[in-house]
């Protein structure tokens, strides 16, 4: 058994972002991570730095996402300085393509609702008909009737981000332990005792950033983390010599040249295997948008489970019963990485989350049940 000041449970994008941010703030956390075969959203990530459409009926989430996207370039520079790794950030805006007038109208209504709910502070967006879209994006198929464009959106190499955060956090002083799945957390008068197979840690403070495991661990420190099943699937093509003309909600070209196709969700499957039916739907929609993709072979497909809360909005919490315990859960680990590292981590270091983050507390679910 050994003693530390701060332990982060979980070494995915959320945990690593916070660990790097803490190390930059002068605190050297211990990061306890699970096994390589664990269900890791961080390694199945699409890599979007995305604002468009987020935060419908949750203006605080819409503005939080936008704020993080805006400071992503600042984070990228600092992360490159600390790790020597370029995470491939590209922020040139993105499109949501519609294959029917009804689809375009539904997206437009959502975007207008977000603009209204945020009092006009959400990023500007353009509603484009087919001709306007064609003037901006060449090579579209005949089924595309229009699009929504938002200049705030971008993408990055999610695996490079994962590697950069791990490299940077350790260079700045964080300690990392893989194959250290935490099984129990016991609050004490001095902090917390974390136990797993073959190890015990006494920690004065603890941060739960364990993804899907948060739901199990949260009650041990007087918190809750209600999650729902959200399985996504991604197709990846061979490397293309021709650049995809733009970024969109369901398609992005990786910096290595392959094209990633995604945007599916299964809510009733616990299997990690991919579905041929979903692959067919993803491929069909992609070809309707960009018919030229028919010249490319799909090389691989994978699935992942999003860390999606019961209402889809991040949970940021601190324990009232056991001071020193914090919890963070979200399915936007890439988009929100900048906020987690540059804003949230310093608050953890100070010992208290600021009041403006209280809207993300899981206590909101108690209030909803009481209504």
Swiss-Prot record:
InterPro entries: FAD-dep_OxRdtase, FAD/NAD-bd_sf. Coiled coil: none annotated. The keyword Methyltransferase does not apply. Keywords: Oxidoreductase. GO terms for molecular function: oxidoreductase activity. Signal peptide: none annotated. The keyword Glycosyltransferase does not apply. Its EC number is 1.-.-.-. GO terms for cellular component: cytoplasm. Pathway: Opine metabolism; octopine degradation. Heterodimer of a subunit A and a subunit B. Oxidative cleavage of octopine into L-arginine and pyruvate. This is Opine oxidase subunit B. It comes from Rhizobium meliloti (Ensifer meliloti). The lineage of its organism: Bacteria, Pseudomonadati, Pseudomonadota, Alphaproteobacteria, Hyphomicrobiales.
């Amino acid at each position: 058994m050994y003693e530390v000041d701060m332990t982060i449970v979980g070494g995915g994008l959320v945990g690593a972002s916070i660990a790097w941010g803490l190390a930059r703030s002068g605190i050297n956390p211990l990061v306890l991570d699970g096994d390589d075969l664990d269900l890791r959203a961080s390694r199945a990530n699409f890599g979007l730095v995305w604002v468009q459409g987020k935060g419908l009926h949750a203006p605080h989430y819409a503005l939080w996402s936008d704020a993080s996207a805006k400071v992503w370039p600042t984070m990228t520079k600092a992360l490159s300085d600390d790790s020597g790794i370029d995470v491939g950030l590209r922020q040139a805006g993105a499109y949501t393509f519609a294959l029917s007038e009804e689809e375009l109208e539904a997206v437009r209504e959502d975007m207008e609702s977000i603009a209204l709910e945020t009092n006009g502070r959400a990023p500007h967006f353009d509603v484009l008909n087919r001709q306007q879209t064609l003037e901006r994006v060449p090579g579209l198929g005949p089924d595309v009737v229009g699009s929504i464009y938002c200049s705030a959106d971008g993408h990055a190499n999610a695996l490079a981000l994962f590697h950069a955060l791990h490299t940077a956090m350790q260079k700045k002083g964080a300690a990392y332990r893989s194959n250290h799945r935490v099984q129990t957390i016991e609050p004490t008068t001095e902090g917390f005792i974390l136990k797993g197979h073959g190890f015990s840690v006494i920690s004065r403070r603890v941060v739960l950033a364990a993804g899907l495991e948060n739901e199990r661990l949260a009650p041990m420190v007087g918190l809750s983390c209600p999650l729902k099943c959200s399985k996504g699937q991604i197709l990846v093509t061979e490397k293309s010599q021709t650049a995809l003309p733009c970024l969109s909600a369901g398609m992005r070209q990786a910096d290595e040249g392959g094209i990633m196709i995604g945007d599916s969700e299964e809510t009733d499957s616990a299997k990690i295997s991919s579905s041929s039916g979903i692959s067919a739907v993803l491929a069909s929609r992609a070809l309707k948008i960009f018919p030229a993709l028919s010249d490319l072979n799909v090389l691989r497909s994978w699935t992942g489970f999003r860390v999606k809360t019961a209402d889809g909005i991040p949970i940021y919490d601190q324990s009232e019963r056991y001071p020193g315990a914090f919890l963070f859960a979200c399915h936007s680990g890439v988009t929100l990485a900048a906020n987690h590292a540059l804003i949230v981590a310093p608050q953890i270091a100070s010992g208290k989350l600021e009041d403006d983050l209280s809207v993300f507390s899981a206590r909101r679910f108690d209030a909803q049940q009481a209504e």
